[in-house]
Amino acid sequence: MDIVKNYLIAFDQYTANFRWESGVTPLSSYVFPFSTSVIYVLVIFALQAIMKNKKGMVLKGFSIIHNINLIILSFSMMSGVMYAAYQQYLEQGAFSLVCEQSSQSVQGRIGFWIYIFYLSKYYELVDTVILALKKKPIIFLHIFHHMAMVPVTWQWLHDQWLVGSWWCTLVNSFIHVLMYYYYLQTTLGNPCWFKKYITKAQIVQFLTGTAMVSYWFVIRDSEKCQAPLSPAIVSNTINSFFIILFGKFYYDSYKSNSRRQEKLNKVE
């Protein structure tokens, strides 16, 4: 028990001392997120072309490991940023979580977990590679979501924008625990009843994020929040696209199907 306790204390101290430095911290240069997004799209289109006349791969074992990895990683990020936000609340007050108190607000514990969240977006690109190799349908929403999140999360750190970043890290990680658990169960061939609730939760995430950022816009000047406007504008713009795209996906996947079934029942 002492070993575990000492490890946790040492790890907490390490995260408390975390510092994001543009051009110094690994993958902190703008070249990495933007080039990755372009390469990601090209690779997916290339894989689809290569697999066009081939049989889709099974990849069951790899998919199981991949989903388990992301369940563990997502749970760790959710727990980590929740603890970091709580510690900041104790040290600086709740208002520090909705209005940056300095130009270096995404540092220390909370900065560490937002950085891990940023890195996780690179790993999540493997989701699409698996779909392409399996010859599964890949919708625009999926590609746009994965492509956009790498540069968006990089900008949070680069511009030291705290408000939307810690909240998105917390809520998105929670949703991804459920989502990758669902993917794991479907890979194992087990039924999973809550698929549509994951999409609902994602829409709620974007709505709450948009509301939080909109509040930040209102108080930014009067409260002298120490962060630039650009990451907030980008995040709310991306959130608006996500709300529309996820809303359409939910309607097409669930509402339109239920209405078609109702019509069939009436005919019968």
From Swiss-Prot:
Origin: domain of life: Eukaryota
Q: What is its EC number?
A: 2.3.1.199
Question: What GO biological process term is on the record, naming one?
Answer: fatty acid elongation, polyunsaturated fatty acid
Q: What's an example of a GO molecular-function annotation for this chain?
A: fatty acid elongase activity
Query: Record keywords: Iron included?
Result: no
Which keywords does this Swiss-Prot/TrEMBL entry list? Answer: Fatty acid biosynthesis, Fatty acid metabolism, Lipid biosynthesis, Lipid metabolism, Membrane, Transferase, Transmembrane, Transmembrane helix
Broad class of the protein's primary localization: membrane
Q: Where in the cell is it found?
A: Membrane
What InterPro entries does the database record attribute to this sequence? Answer: ELO_fam
Query: GO CC annotations?
Result: endoplasmic reticulum membrane
What's the stated role of this polypeptide?
Could be implicated in synthesis of very long chain fatty acids.
- Name-wise, this protein is Fatty acid elongase sre1
Q: Which organism is it from?
A: Dictyostelium discoideum
